């Protein structure tokens, strides 16, 4: 979880992290990270997008993102993902990296809620 010292700080510029009380309960996620050699994940979250829902075009700005790689693991639902003008249909089970420093968006084109696990890791040439 992202942490700031006080309300005047922008979370997008904070490198501080705190594990949530549930962090150690997600044993399958830890196994998944280990299978890809990911030892120090940064921020991570599960996101739900309802049928027909969209995440509008945006860039993840702020100093936090400058040295992080962003990954998605699609768990449920089918969605259209667009990054820098390139579109892909993402099916459950798809694991991918993309540059969140470029314009990106998502649209749930499936018939169930999209559930995706999104996480960042410090940039490293050995990342998946």
Provide a role label for each language-model segment.
Residues 54-62:
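Histidine-centered catalytic micro-motifs
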Residues 31-55:
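A short glycine-rich, His/Asp/Glu-containing loop-to-beta-strand
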Residues 48, 63-80:
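Short, conserved beta-strand element in jelly-roll/cupin
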Residues 89-104:
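Conserved metal-binding segment of the jelly-roll/cupin
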Residues 1-38:
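Non-heme Fe(II)/2-oxoglutarate
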Residues 12-14, 40, 89-91, 125-128:
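Catalytic phosphate/metal-binding cores of nucleic-acid and nucleotide-processing enzymes, i.e., regions
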Residues 69-74, 95-97, 111-128:
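A short hydrophobic beta-strand segment most commonly corresponding to one strand
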Residues 56, 72-92:
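A short beta-strand-loop-beta hairpin characteristic of the jelly-roll/cupin
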